[in-house]
């Protein structure tokens, strides 16, 4: 299955983080509310389906969080200290 423009449900079901693309979450449907230890993104079901939505949970949209991860290594500058370097595999279809 090719990645979709605004998220890849198949990749998320395998445990890949929708923000950074690393295999850090449990195998589940999008919206498990788990926090990725690599980028500190909370897996929010609304933001997974609407990447421009800014929630009270993550305080940035999924699209902005992906851009932030590429520049600062975290979903937002406010959570950089809560992240770590990845040692998990990354989704080969990354970026979404």
Describe each PLM feature range.
Residues 14, 33:
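Residues immediately within or flanking Cys/His clusters that coordinate Zn2+
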Residues 17-20, 36-39:
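Short cysteine-rich clusters marking metal-coordination/redox-active sites
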Residues 1-9, 51-96:
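Short, intrinsically disordered terminal segments enriched in charged and Pro/Gly residues
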Residues 35, 46-48:
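Compact nucleic-acid interaction/catalytic patches
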Residues 26-27, 44-46:
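Short, non-ligating residues that shape and space the ligands of small metal-coordination modules
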Residues 2-8, 19-27:
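Short, intrinsically disordered, charge-biased short linear motifs at domain edges
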């Amino acid at each position: 299955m090719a990645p979709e423009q605004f998220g890849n449900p198949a990749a998320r079901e395998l445990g890949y983080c929708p923000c950074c693309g690393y295999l850090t979450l449990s195998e589940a449907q999008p919206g498990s509310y788990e926090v990725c230890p690599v980028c500190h993104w909370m897996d929010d079901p609304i933001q997974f389906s609407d990447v421009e939505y800014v929630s009270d949970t993550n305080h940035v949209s999924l699209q902005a969080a992906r851009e932030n991860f590429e520049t600062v290594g975290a979903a937002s500058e406010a959570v950089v200290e809560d992240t770590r370097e990845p040692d998990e595999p990354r989704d080969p279809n990354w970026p979404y």
